[in-house]
Amino acid sequence: MIEIKNVSKTYPNGTKGLKNIDLTIERGEFVVVVGLSGAGKSTLLRSINRLNEITDGEILIDGLSITKAKGKELRQIRQRTAMIFQSFNLVKRSSVLRNVLSGRVGYHGTLRTVLNLFPKQDVELALQALNRVNILEKAYSRASDLSGGQQQRVAIARALAQEPSVILADEPTASLDPLTTKQVMDDLKRINKEDKITTIVNLHFIDLAREYATRIIGLRAGEVVFDGPVSEATDEKFAEIYGRPIQEDELLGEELDEPASEHASQ
């Protein structure tokens, strides 16, 4: 469970990134956050795992305050809170397997991880994670040799290697084509269902949000202006969230319905 209690974020220049956010996200939910660029979507996700420091309020993950946590306790909470980025954040010169193993860094000492001395069970866990996203055959390839879709699936495998209770995905499909977008979202949704991992995803495309979410949260200028099930997320509601009618580039379109064939090759 994630509890966001009256959270605000004010930047040094006075800009309000978040305004009095109150949300409770239950274990196993698949939540999609939508809103215009600058609405606070990334700020919210980065505040949950404390990549951003909030100005007011408190955030609890599984009953533990990440806002107040320090040292070992903070590291332990972050170990269980995996982040997936739009830009993949892989070490391109390293192998796919080594990138996935970086998800285990929080469980070991610095020297051991620098020297790549991961125990056998960690290697097995990393390989299993790659298999779950259908990219096991690329384990010993350089990350730089992979397509964008393959790199994002490596990032998902890295998140899985953390054995998280929460996955935060910040625009994970923004740089991908429609077919690969569906494959990546299918992976995230399947993992959410199978492992009951609480998943929060920031998305640009409205139809994608409707297809995958169990709950949609709409942000506008740092405030929650919609929070409800997909059935209530009408075009009119999205127009309220965005402050204007839906535009064509906010819909992925019919290509979303193409069969996700050749999954591992994209």
UniProtKB/Swiss-Prot annotation:
The protein's matches in PROSITE patterns, at most eight in alphabetical order, are given as:
ABC_TRANSPORTER_1 (PS00211), ABC_TRANSPORTER_2 (PS50893), PHNC (PS51249)
Membrane topology classification: Peripheral membrane protein
Where ATP is bound, by residue? 35-42
Say if the entry is tagged with keyword Repressor.
no
> Secretion signal: which residues?
none
InterPro entries reported in the protein's UniProt record: AAA+_ATPase (IPR003593), ABC_transporter-like_ATP-bd (IPR003439), ABC_transporter-like_CS (IPR017871), ABC_transpr_PhnC (IPR012693), MetN_ABC_transporter-like (IPR050086), P-loop_NTPase (IPR027417)
Where it sits in the cell: the answer is: Cell membrane
Q: Name one GO molecular function term.
A: ATP hydrolysis activity
Reactions performed catalytically: phosphonate(out) + ATP + H2O = phosphonate(in) + ADP + phosphate + H(+)
EC number of this enzyme:
7.3.2.2
Q: Which GO terms describe its cellular component?
A: plasma membrane
- Pfam families linked to this entry: ABC_tran
Top EC class for this record = translocase
Which positions, given as ranges, span the membrane? none
Primary localization? membrane
Q: Does the keyword Repressor apply?
A: no
Cystine crosslinks: none
ABC transporter domain: residues covered: 2-246
Q: Which family does it belong to?
A: Belongs to the ABC transporter superfamily. Phosphonates importer (TC 3.A.1.9.1) family.
Tell me how this protein assembles. The complex is composed of two ATP-binding proteins (PhnC), two transmembrane proteins (PhnE) and a solute-binding protein (PhnD).
Database matches in NCBIfam families? ABC_phnC
* Its biological purpose: Part of the ABC transporter complex PhnCDE involved in phosphonates import. Responsible for energy coupling to the transport system.
Q: What is this protein called?
A: Phosphonates import ATP-binding protein PhnC
**What is this protein's gene name?**
phnC
